[in-house]
């Protein structure tokens, strides 16, 4: 079981190196992350985009392109679709967003002919390695699903479990996070949490243990759980935090990023291959960590 990103990177040494297709690769921060990933055997890469601009950026950041496959496609929409094709056809194992707007990128991901649709819910999973914490924290969904309904939450849990399994956590503990740790029929998130816990009890959601509802404190702190009399195998020990909506999840994501000493990475799952969808504000390290996470998920998918 990996407890931090150093241990996650060590896990990659045990699997064949995976290949990432970068859509519209003429993006300096993305190419810097790709350089780091390839130099440390985290992943190999196929760069799809404007070849001249890619070479100009590579020269600026001292990136030797001699070992890279480059597909010269100047139009961003065509380049993005070609990168998706590389993944759906098996020539690459994962997809990464470069210098292309998110809407165009996702349209290609969802393309009916060559896209990465599976019929499952797509969701974002962030993984945090917080200094002083004894385990990784998996957070969903801070980027993709806005106001998930109950059926969406089932899909979000299943997707987060896939990532947790890839990180070596065989039976992750899942906590649906709510304002309070008791069922209140005026708070739909608490009702959903109780239903999810019952589905877990009956084996309807597999590969994990779900309990709830939980307030954040008694989901992650055994001391807080004990103080409030909250018991069970998940209380104070949660690995996966299912937030009720994107507002709560995004605030928590940014709180952990800016108010704690932590490392993180994230990816889009529910697709036929992992998708790395970082933002312009994400750090260099976050981009590299996201590539590593995607490589682990891709290795488990094979």
From Swiss-Prot:
Function: Catalyzes the conversion of butyryl-CoA through butyryl phosphate to butyrate.
Keyword Cytoplasm: no
Enzyme class at the top of the EC tree: transferase
Catalytic activity: butanoyl-CoA + phosphate = butanoyl phosphate + CoA
The EC number(s) this enzyme carries: 2.3.1.19
Record family assignment: Belongs to the phosphate acetyltransferase and butyryltransferase family.
Name of protein: Phosphate butyryltransferase
Gene expressing this chain: ptb
Pathway assigned to this chain's UniProt record: Lipid metabolism; butanoate metabolism
Alphabetized Pfam families for the sequence: PTA_PTB
Keyword annotations: Acyltransferase, Transferase
The organism of origin for this protein: Clostridium beijerinckii (strain ATCC 51743 / NCIMB 8052) (Clostridium acetobutylicum)
One example GO MF annotation: phosphate butyryltransferase activity
Gene3D superfamilies the UniProt entry points to: Isopropylmalate Dehydrogenase
BP-aspect Gene Ontology terms: butyrate metabolic process
